[in-house]
Amino acid sequence: MTLSADVAGAEKGPAKGGRRRPPRTPKGRQLDTAAVQEVQALLTDKPRRRDLLIEHLHLVQDHYGHLSAAHLAALAAEMKMALTEVYEVATFYSHFDVVKDGNPPPPVTVRVCDSLSCAMAGAEKLLKDLPGKLGQNVRVVHAPCMGACDHAPVCAVGHVQTFKATPESVAAAVKSNPHAHAWDKHTGLAAYQKAGGYTLLKDCLSGKRSRDDVIKIVSDAGLRGLGGAGFPTGRKWSLVRAEPAPRMFAVNADEGEPGTFKDRFYLERDPHRFLEGMLIAAWVVEAPETYIYIRDEYPEIRLMLLDEIERIETAGLSPHTKLHLRRGAGAYICGEESAMIESIEGKRGLPRPRPPYVAQVGLFGRPTLEQNVETLYWIRDIVEKGAEWVTAQGRHERKGFRSFSVSGRVKNPGVKLAPAGVTVRELIEEFSGGMADGHTFTGYLPGGASGGILPESMADLPLDFGTLEKYGCFVGSHAVVILSDKDDMKAVALNLMKFFEDESCGQCTPCRVGTEKAARLMENGPWNQELLIELSAAMRDASICGLGQAASNPLTCVLKYFPDELTKPLRTW
């Protein structure tokens, strides 16, 4: 047999030593020169720090409508990160479209909210009807709560939301090719200052007010964290202040609990009241840097805050803390305090084991104060008017006031500022115009998806921190969804379980597997009550964070309070 010269040479091998080494060739994905140049053009002179990874991914996603493999590799090279790290982060967040090269998604994406309030208003029918109405160049996908439950059903064309959506209104929105613009229906800096705004902050910075005095007023008023946990605010400030400097400050504007939209309500109307409270809190704990983490579903508010923060800085109102605005990317889990910190640092939003708590080891490894938007919104009023202004309000032996996000089967849904301890029956009749026509009140969610479900027979319980726990429920973020005789309680619990299944970060097995198994058991045939109870207990007792621990609350409440529903066929909307 005659060999070619190349093969013959190869067979001779090296004269001495081991086997011949193959010629060196590059391994792995090779950088695309054009993609590198495109990424560089988007980043310009922005820092290539790890904590800015999600911000940079947004730049590419916003410009091209997706994240290609070539752009991810180019971004990894620019930031001197492993491609696997960039890929893991990009694929963790639902608002990033990671695609193969040459396989981009349709140019327009329509997201249909199918969380409970929107499902009750016809989201399922929208998901069925829209693809045929919009055509092949539009992608229709389901999405979690968009923070506009009082306008259900809600769709987002790109990043612009359509309220009380119909196939016709969504088609018109697609045709108009909308783009998000800065929100402009709020009280601006000049008007806020004219009404006395930032006077308290100036008094704090000038020494007219002491940190201890401000903490005492806030503590005496009984202000608690209004994002869901309800931890006493003054105590939290004192705990963080006791930790060594430098301390950090992180603001949670990522309200993603289904049924919750009160932070959006206040930010759209009076953002500087929130910003002044935030700057006072930063002064109290002496935080040289403050990070605001806002959900991606609120693009108009994000753009508005960028403008207002620039005005604050120009006016010299924030000399004590550097302000950063960070953008979420569609992950409910980032509402959990440590997951949010991971996301601000440019990582996947995975909750951290505790201890240590974020007040001890938080953002960038430093002691960190973390607060919700509404908590900070009330700081100015409480300190200026005194603790008595708060404690003089309340009902049923509770003190203070609460902002309730009310949606579902009422005539007038919306944010209702009501006395702490108000009952859901009072909330419906006095604040929400009564039940919607043709609906009979049968049950309610007192605290969003996580807070459980209670029957109409328990509608006279005070709604406040600590009043519902013995019934297997809690008020959490005060998101109240009203249910009627038109709603199947099994379908309600299934909708919420599917939400948790979708939003589980996947880090721990009890939550990842438990939510999936529970959803399958709940949607297929008669409920296996014994197995569902056992599964719920495992999720509650062994999950790392509050998502898995609370995911079974609606399920267990239906088993406990609505036994007559269990024998009926599943009836969706």
PLM features per residue range, with description:
Residues K16-V110, D114-M146, D150-A180, T199-D220, ...:
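Ferredoxin-type iron-sulfur electron-transfer modules in oxidoreductases and energy-metabolism complexes
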Residues Y93, D270-V284:
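Histidine-anchored nucleotide/phosphate-binding helix
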Residues V157-H159, S407, K411-P413, P446-G447:
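Short strand-turn-strand beta-turns centered on an Asx-Gly dipeptide
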Residues Y192-T199, V251-D263, V358-L363, S405-V410:
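Gly-rich Lys/Arg/Thr-decorated short loops/hinges at beta-loop-alpha junctions or inter-strand turns
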Residues C204-E243, T391, S405, L417-A418, ...:
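Accessory "access/gating" subregions that flank catalytic or transport cores
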Residues K236, T290, G433-G448:
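Short loop-to-beta-strand transition segments
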Residues G277-L279, A420-A436:
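Short amphipathic, charge-patterned alpha-helical segments
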Residues R302-A420, S432:
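Hydrophobic alpha-helical positions that pack around
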